Amino acid sequence: MVAPYMGYVEVCEALNRLTPGTGKKKSALFNSGAEALENAVKIARRFTKREAVVVFEHGYHGRTNLTMAMTAKNMPYKDGFGPFAPEFYRMPMAYPYRWPGGPEKCAEEALDVVIHKIEKELGADRVAAIVLEPIQGEGGFIVPPQGFIKGLSEFCTKHGIVFI
């Protein structure tokens, strides 16, 4: 958000100061989660020079055209609003309550499925970003099992993928 308000500048300066790392930092403020997510995807694509973005079943990301492409649920959000932006690929969510192998195997099995699908169907070298809600609210308040998010983060780091 480009604005001449000192309060915005102060918040961005505080974010930069509190964010770990010694490199040059920039902060941006947006008016909605959808706008923030669209910009995160643009930044990831520009930074990685890749186009593919991985999202998950049951996810809700917003009501803009780009975030509707990322949203899993057709009704009531997407019906009649297409065509949507390309290069979004949906993966199964680690959903302990409904995972076929049961909750105790969910993290490991779901991570294996997601990584296999990315590596074999997309190619990790094509993926700019993986977008995951830490707790999916719209999908039924799905809390991924311990180890799933950490495993995705490690996969992203290994392959130069931005984890949003």
What are these regions (language model features)?
Residues L111, A124, I142-I164:
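Catalytic PLP-binding core of fold-type I/II PLP enzymes
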Residues M1-E51, G62:
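Glycine-rich loop-to-alpha-helix module at the N-terminal edge of alpha/beta enzyme cores
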Residues F30, F56, E133:
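Conserved residues at the C-terminal ends of beta-strands
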Residues R45-K49, A69-K78, G147-G151:
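A glycine- and small-aliphatic-rich helix-loop capping segment at beta-alpha/alpha-beta transitions
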Residues Y60-I135, V143:
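PLP-dependent aminotransferase-class I/II
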Residues A40, V131, F163-I164:
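Generic enzyme active-site microenvironment
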Residues T22-K25, T48-A52, F84-E87, D125-V127, ...:
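Short coil/turn connectors at secondary-structure junctions
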